Amino acid sequence: MTHPDEKPWILGLTGGIGSGKSAAAKCFSDLGIDTVDADHAARWVVEPGRPALEQIAAHFGKGVLQTSGELDRGALRKLIFETPEQRRWLEALLHPLINQEIVSHLAKAKSPYAILVSPLLVESGQYRMVQRLLVIDAPAHLQIERTMLRDSSSQEQVEAILKVQIQREDRLRHANDVLVNDRDHAWLSSEVERLHHFYLTLRGGQS
């Protein structure tokens, strides 16, 4: 448990779509480690009533809103995939707000170390918040198969997402640790437990 006046030791956890980063994060959580998911923070900042949602609707038009007033993520995703400039505008708006949410939640961590789970850890600059970076990696064919199964997406849709995401080599270049998730869940769980004990050792060495 961290001391009230002590900054939490943060592990960054990232990986491409279909790599299994969420499954790995769940394994860490099952071991009692507090996790903050950047995707959840990204949803919080665009909830109805939040200023960011109003700015998005003003910029892209009411077509990105559902009848309930909530963000229509599918409509927005289509717009930003088709126009890189629009994606950059959206990132410039949301990334600082998301980072504020992340910092706030990480500060509340009570476990020996905390984990920031983010698919955009490297490209958003969020890696600067962490003391160590773990990349969950997987062969491209497995990423495609898993995502098609999970999201009922076509192969073309998944490949398009992979092209937009940061290049695998760039992600790996920032990594302190790499876990190649190409086996079953039991193996993944045992590898996470091994890393967990290693991180406890590192955390114990922090002043």
Swiss-Prot record:
Origin superkingdom: Bacteria
A single MF term (Gene Ontology): ATP binding
Stored CDD domains: DPCK
Domain DPCK per the UniProt entry, residue ranges: 10-207
EC assignment: 2.7.1.24
Pfam families in UniProt: CoaE
One CC-aspect GO term: cytoplasm
Keywords per UniProt: ATP-binding, Coenzyme A biosynthesis, Cytoplasm, Kinase, Nucleotide-binding, Transferase
Residues binding ATP: G18, S19, G20, K21, S22, A23
PROSITE patterns noted in UniProt: DPCK
Protein's pathway: Cofactor biosynthesis; coenzyme A biosynthesis; CoA from (R)-pantothenate: step 5/5
Function: Catalyzes the phosphorylation of the 3'-hydroxyl group of dephosphocoenzyme A to form coenzyme A.
UniProt name for this protein: Dephospho-CoA kinase
Source taxonomy: Bacteria, Pseudomonadati, Pseudomonadota, Gammaproteobacteria, Pseudomonadales
